[in-house]
From Swiss-Prot:
One of its GO terms (biological process) is mitochondrial electron transport, ubiquinol to cytochrome c. It is a multi-pass membrane protein. The lineage of its organism: Eukaryota, Metazoa, Chordata, Craniata, Vertebrata. One of its GO terms (molecular function) is metal ion binding. This is Cytochrome b. InterPro entries: Cyt_b/b6_C, Cyt_b/b6_C_sf, Cyt_b/b6_N, Cytb/b6-like_sf, Cytochrome_b, Cytochrome_b_C_euk/bac, Cytochrome_b_N_euk/bac, Di-haem_cyt_TM. Belongs to the cytochrome b family. Heme b b566 binds at H98, H197. It comes from Falco peregrinus (Peregrine falcon).
Length: 380
């Protein structure tokens, strides 16, 4: 009998073991869809980004005009740009849901998978930040100025570091050129890191909502979950196409329709919505270095999740107290996102400070304590 190429060919065999014959727990829910959704987001972003890069000019005098030209004169250029800009929002929605799932179901106990995932998040945030600068509108320019300036808070080397990043004494042509180069490069780095992330995941296999081993009862990924994933793709592309076709500028800042002008500062400098929670934490501390450290800690705190797990149960499925805290954390992040979009004045300052404090308190103190308390209640 002729050998099955799917199982014998060295390259096809790898694809088969990752996407077709992969043994998968039979009880994983829709929350396990987000990994593949992130994959399709990345593919969409790379494709639309490549098409945009063909018409873009990374020069301060031409960048804004080249984006306008793409939208006006290139066949379906407006659609490609709208898909790329709103695709970033979908990407972040998916990654935040994916991380939330990981925290709720204790997936962070797969330490290597979790840590590579956080590195992926940081790379994605860097990519989105440098990408936002490229249209060279007012918010692009001032966002780049404000965020890169934060590095000057680093003692001793800060100022040198910022001028080195800028390629001069302010955000100018060299900055735009290097940001374009980075924005082109980083998605391919993300693709490479994704493969590492998956390699680590397939070492242990997927977690499941019960948090117990499922080695005794697994089903092949295809056709069961491949079909379920395609449903997920359709449900994700629906809001993406709706945004891109009906309200393409809903999530953008109107300031970015004005070409960058170093002499005019916008009244409210703020990043895209998916960074607002971190921006609110940054602003809640009245000291520059303190703010930068809090900003870094707001994401890097995820590295501590495996160390802060004190419960004898892996998931929160049967832990109502931890569940309440988890949803409190989600609400807290929504409040931070809202506060980040508001001007720096009363009452937003105090709301932001309280929300920032409760964010760190919940993750560092309340969740581990509740885990230990639940062990006691259940006589573990």
């Amino acid at each position: 009998m002729a050998p099955n190429i799917r199982k014998s060919h060295p390259l096809v065999k790898m694809i088969n073991n990752s996407l077709i014959d992969l043994p998968t727990p039979p009880n994983i829910s829709i929350w396990w869809n987000f990994g593949s959704l992130l994959g399709i987001c990345l593919a969409t972003q790379i494709l639309t980004g490549l098409l945009l890069a063909m018409h873009y000019t990374a020069d301060t005098t031409l960048a804004f005009s080249s984006v306008a030209h793409t939208c006006r004169n290139v066949q379906y250029g407006w659609l490609i740009r709208n898909l790329h800009a709103n695709g970033a929002s979908l990407f972040f929605i998916c990654i935040y849901m994916h991380i939330g799932r990981g925290i709720y179901y204790g997936s962070y106990l797969y330490k290597e998978t979790w840590n590579t995932g956080i590195i992926l998040l940081l790379t994605l945030m860097a990519t989105a930040f440098v990408g936002y600068v490229l249209p060279w509108g007012q918010m692009s320019f001032w966002g780049a100025t404000v965020i890169t300036n934060l590095f000057s808070a680093i003692p001793y080397i800060g100022q040198t570091l910022v001028e080195w990043a800028w390629g001069g004494f302010s955000v100018d042509n060299p900055t735009l050129t290097r940001f374009f180069a980075l924005h082109f490069l980083l998605p391919f780095l993300i693709a490479g890191l994704t493969l590492i992330h998956l390699t680590f995941l397939h070492e242990s296999g997927s977690n499941n909502p019960l948090g117990i081993t499922s080695n005794c009862d697994k089903i092949p990924f295809h056709p069961y979950y491949s079909l379920k994933d395609i449903l997920g793709f359709m449900l994700m592309y629906l809001p993406l196409m709706t945004l891109a076709l009906f309200t393409p500028n809903l999530l953008g800042d109107p300031e970015n329709f004005t070409p960058a002008n170093p002499l005019v500062t916008p009244p409210h400098i703020k990043p895209e919505w998916y960074f607002l929670f971190a921006y609110a934490i940054l602003r809640s501390i009245p000291n520059k270095l303190g703010g930068v450290l809090a900003l870094a800690a707001s994401v890097l705190i995820l590295f501590l999740s495996p160390l802060l797990h004190k419960s004898k149960q892996r998931t929160m499925t049967f832990r109502p107290l931890s569940q309440s805290l988890f949803w409190l954390l989600v609400t807290n992040l929504l409040i931070l996102t809202w506060v980040g979009s508001q001007p720096v004045e009363h009452p937003f300052i105090i709301i932001g400070q309280l929300a920032s404090l409760s964010y760190f308190t919940t993750l560092l103190i309340l969740l581990p304590l509740t885990g230990a308390l639940e062990n006691k209640i259940l006589n573990y």
